[in-house]
Amino acid sequence: MKDTLPSATQVLKEAFDTLDSALENFSPVLAVQHVGWVEYIGKGIARVGGLPGVRCEELLAFPGGLLGLALDADEDQVGVVLFGDYTHLQAGDEVRRTGRVLDVPVGDGLIGRVVNPVGRCLDGGKPVAFQRQLPVERPAPPIMDRLPVTQPLMTGIKVIDALIPIGRGQRELILGDRQTGKTAIAIDAIINQRDQDVVCIYCAIGQRAASVAGVVTELRNCGALDYTIVVVAEGDAPPGLQYIAPYAATSMAEHFMEHGRDVLIVYDDLTRHARAYREISLLLRRPPGREAFPGDIFYVHSRLLERATHLNEPRGGGSLTALPIIETEAQNLSAYIPTNLISITDGQIYLSPELFQKGLLPSVDVGKSVSRVGGKTQLAAYRAVAGDLRLTYAQFEELEAFARFGTRLDEETRQVLHRGRRVRAILKQTQSSPRTAPQQVLVLHSLNSGVFDTVDEEALPAAEQAICAAVSEIPEIVDKILQGKTLSQEDLDVMHTVAKRVTRPFIKLGEEGHAGAAGDAT
């Protein structure tokens, strides 16, 4: 026992010496923290006092790890938008400044994942592995950092690629009433990017969870989730999350664009985004304007969509193509949000409920749809085979309206109606069945050259399928189409010959001679 006492004493002495040394070396640093308190809690917002120096759009920390975004700064209070469950908050709770703005994770680790607007995974997988973080709000690239839109972005949808072409870096609005196929067009465009080396982002704003789950399942089944990021702010999410969702998704897209990649982003939809911002503004007691929207609603959407562009080489050379979706009411295109977005974007694709009810899918109203930029990017082969298609279709629709009155029609008018019905039938396309550019060019050339004129209407889908399969027989012409080269008359003749041969089994009885005459005349 006596032998152990010195060792115990020695241990205690060493311990106290270590503590004394630590105390001598300890030099406390004072840290100033700006602390306020909650004065009022509303639906998704809070009013905070005691923070006179807070900056606009600064993040504030609430109890329980809840974050909020400072949007309003009055003399005595700060209006804050909350980003999570706020039911545990009460008046008097402590609020701290963070000194930073809201940012989101970006990088390849997000591809194939389903996340919320702040980057938290919603698919039950591992936490997102990210390379860096970018602010949600970023200024749009200046004019001198941009390039003209010169490369096409193929959607795989015949009526769009032929009549309303979209270029990489363009902003093309998709609008229409409820249940007219707006989301279906955007999803088909994503599916068609499978082999195009394009990163896709689908941003769901205010959608039902079941609808988003259906979209994710379709993307996964088609193999499109391998190059797609899904950003979700569900309908029951706080309005603050719905408000920042498109900005967060755009920051994720800009990371790839600045690294020289092409990106396609879909905002589904900005009508719900505008309503979420209206709700926030009314709760923050901002003065309402037209349709109760705040006065800066135009700026809210313009600063978002101006971030879509084609960058020059010093900035990375990538592109960001935006497909914003909005919902109209009773086909009213002159409402506040539709007119705002039509003026901001580079064109619009209008989906008609009347065409949808007739089963003409996609229900694109060609007369009310336009692409103000994409025409310059269209492949040369399209201009050769679909140059007059828009005019032909417009004349057909006008004549069809007059023909309903039962007047006697001359032979030329009957031929226009006959060709127009086939144009309308060929432009029909089922969902999730994109066509490649060579397939579309061969089908459209066959349409213009009269190959389909003698095919029975019921057999048109089968005849079109046969023509698409025949693309493998003309590899040299396919290469020309994909390289953007102009097709020679010899190429057109070869395409016509192939189309006539593969559609011969579908020609109506007694029309053989007429088919040959029509082809020769063309």
From Swiss-Prot:
GO terms for cellular component: plasma membrane; proton-transporting ATP synthase complex. It is a peripheral membrane protein. InterPro entries: Alt_ATP_synth_F1_asu, ATP_synth_asu-like_sf, ATP_synth_asu_C, ATP_synth_asu_C_sf, ATP_synth_F1_a_nt-bd_dom, ATP_synth_F1_asu, ATPase_a/bsu_AS, ATPase_F1/V1/A1_a/bsu_N. It is found in: Cell inner membrane. It comes from the Bacteria. The keyword Iron does not apply. Keywords: ATP synthesis, ATP-binding, Cell inner membrane, Cell membrane, CF(1), Hydrogen ion transport, Ion transport, Membrane, Nucleotide-binding, Translocase, Transport. It is an enzyme of class 7 (translocase). It catalyses: ATP + H2O + 4 H(+)(in) = ADP + phosphate + 5 H(+)(out). The keyword DNA repair does not apply. ATP binds at residues 176-183. Disulfide bonds: none annotated. SUPFAM superfamilies: C-terminal domain of alpha and beta subunits of F1 ATP synthase, N-terminal domain of alpha and beta subunits of F1 ATP synthase, P-loop containing nucleoside triphosphate hydrolases. Transmembrane segments: none annotated. One of its GO terms (molecular function) is ADP binding. Its EC number is 7.1.2.2. The record marks 369 as: Required for activity. Belongs to the ATPase alpha/beta chains family. Produces ATP from ADP in the presence of a proton gradient across the membrane. The alpha chain is a regulatory subunit. F-type ATPases have 2 components, CF(1) - the catalytic core - and CF(0) - the membrane proton channel. CF(1) has five subunits: alpha(3), beta(3), gamma(1), delta(1), epsilon(1). CF(0) has three main subunits: a(1), b(2) and c(9-12). The alpha and beta chains form an alternating ring which encloses part of the gamma chain. CF(1) is attached to CF(0) by a central stalk formed by the gamma and epsilon chains, while a peripheral stalk is formed by the delta and b chains. This is ATP synthase subunit alpha 2.
